[in-house]
Amino acid sequence: IDNISGNLFEDQKGFQGLHQDLKFLENYPYIEKFLRNLFCYQCDTQKEADERLLWVLAWMSKSFVNYDKRRTAIVIHGAEGTGKDTFVNLFFKRYFSEKFCSVVSNEELKSNFTSQKLASCLLCQMNEIKGDFRDGNTVFDKIKTLITEREFKYELKGQNSLYLPCYFNVIICSNDTKPIQVSDTARRYSVF
């Protein structure tokens, strides 16, 4: 798959136009199968699956080409071994490099201090998130802020806090069946 994804990057010139149709995926059957297994397994029709896959590819394309903050997080939940980390590693870490892709745990989000990893990343993978739906849940509020705001409070232990630009997009991965609280009107999350 590593060689295949490398060719995909070269052929698509940084993913420009990637999200316009799925025909180009015919040249990458393993990647197409992987993406469909990860994002379309709950779809009832081919049309629904294609629309869902196009949405994911558009999200990726705009992240890669414009380094655009999408203000909507991709939430991937499922059993172990479904490919959540592989998706991030195969596409995002390969494109942005490990240096600009940060993995933040549930425990780091619970902390009063900000993970130093967030200061310079372009993609934040929130890994093994577990839903805590009590009122006043600071993790839930922190996640919402990191997804949508253009700045975030950067607070290190023993130092004054400051606000930094928030360029990164968020992918939330979890084995939990309900990793995050999403209402019917939520605009911040696309759950797969």
Tell where the protein language model's regions lie, with residue ranges.
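Conserved catalytic/switch belt of AAA+ P-loop NTPases
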Residues: 139-163
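A Trp-anchored, charged/polar loop motif used as the substrate-binding/catalytic surface
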Residues: 33, 37-43, 149-153, 170-173
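Signature of the SF2 helicase/ATPase Hel1-core->accessory helical subdomain module
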Residues: 144-151, 170, 178, 191
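P-loop NTPase catalytic core of nucleic-acid-dependent motor ATPases
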Residues: 2-129, 139-140, 190-192
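AAA+/SF3 P-loop NTPase mechanochemical coupling elements
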Residues: 113-119, 155-173
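A short helix-turn-beta junction within AAA+ P-loop NTPase domains corresponding to the substrate/partner-engaging
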Residues: 181-192
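Conserved nucleotide-binding/hydrolysis micro-motifs of P-loop NTPases
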Residues: 130-131, 175-179
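Conserved ATPase-coupling elements of RecA-like P-loop NTPase cores
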Residues: 132-140, 182-183
